């Protein structure tokens, strides 16, 4: 459980930290709005020295609830509710289990395993793209839907424990050959739903004191203009460029997880 060691839990940030935080959250919003990944990792890196490592995951639950909510709003036309609901059926129990075990579980093991799996998915996806004789749309992506159940549960569990683990479901959705906007919209809907569950659970576990809630809400709101800018920019980028951004963020996130696990 989170036990603040200072009055109100955290020192009041000065104006420099506040301005830096706004800039970081804006850029993180742009990155996530273009690729579906990276927002949590960037903000987590900024917050850790301010609120403490153990408070990062509870804070991110609120931040990403707000951030993903804005992605749903801006990319709503690409949302597939059937896929979202199907994944949430198993992801939600996994998220609840992860939240309850968060304070005691060895995170490094999951970071390493997740990083390796994500890199493997990306390599297979890239190989299939290079070896396909026709357009990407001819890959017959329905062959991988059998993995939806296991991926959903594992994602829900790890998402509560490891910052940046949302890239797992991003890699899965990307491998189904969805459009870029559909990947971002469906990933955001799944993540927002799970983050709502995590917020409620962390509050019950006393891991989200009021001062931390205020900091997290401020960070989440600061990221919304970045998502809007990403939506505007995405309509002006070529599809190949957007796919490249997504693949690049998936690879960087996986490498980052491996570095944290074994570095």
Residue spans of the language-model regions?
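Transmembrane helix exit motif
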Residues: 68-78, 115-139, 231-232, 252-263
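Residues within membrane-spanning alpha-helices of integral membrane proteins
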Residues: 61, 114-118, 122, 188, ...
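Membrane-interface helix termini and inter-helical loops of multi-pass transporters
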Residues: 9-11, 99-109, 133-135, 202-214, ...
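Glycine/small-residue-rich loop that forms an oxyanion/phosphate-binding "nest" at active or ligand-binding sites
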Residues: 81-125
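Small-residue-rich hydrophobic segments that form or flank transmembrane alpha-helices
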Residues: 14-86, 151-156, 164-223, 227-231
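Residues that define the loop-to-transmembrane-helix transition and helix capping
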Residues: 54, 82, 108-111, 181, ...
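Interfacial loop-to-transmembrane junctions
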Residues: 228-250
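Hydrophobic alpha-helical transmembrane segments in multi-pass integral membrane proteins
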Residues: 155-163, 198, 253-263
């Amino acid at each position: 459980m989170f036990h603040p060691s200072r009055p109100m839990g955290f020192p009041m940030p000065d104006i420099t930290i506040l301005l830096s935080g706004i800039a970081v959250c804006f850029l993180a919003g742009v990155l996530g709005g273009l690729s579906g990944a990276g927002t949590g990792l960037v903000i987590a890196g900024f917050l850790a020295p301010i609120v403490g490592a153990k408070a990062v995951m509870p804070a991110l639950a609120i931040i990403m609830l707000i951030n993903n909510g804005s992605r749903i709003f801006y990319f709503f036309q690409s949302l597939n509710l059937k896929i979202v609901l199907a994944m949430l059926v198993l992801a939600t129990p996994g998220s609840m289990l992860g939240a309850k075990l968060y304070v005691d579980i060895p995170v490094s093991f999951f970071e390493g395993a997740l990083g390796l799996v994500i890199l493997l998915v990306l390599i297979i996806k890239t190989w299939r793209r290079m070896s396909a004789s026709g357009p990407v749309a001819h890959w017959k992506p329905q062959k991988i839907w059998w993995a939806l159940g296991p991926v959903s549960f594992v994602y829900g569990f790890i998402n509560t424990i490891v910052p940046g683990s949302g890239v797992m479901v991003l890699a899965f959705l990307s491998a189904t050959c969805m459009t870029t906007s559909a990947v971002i919209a469906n990933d955001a809907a799944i993540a927002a739903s799970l983050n709502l569950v995590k917020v409620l659970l962390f509050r019950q576990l006393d891991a989200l004191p009021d001062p931390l809630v205020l900091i997290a809400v401020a960070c989440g709101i600061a990221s919304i203009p970045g998502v809007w800018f990403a939506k505007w920019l995405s309509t002006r980028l070529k599809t190949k460029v957007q796919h490249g951004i997504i693949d690049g963020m998936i690879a960087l996130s996986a490498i980052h997880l491996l570095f944290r696990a074994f570095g």
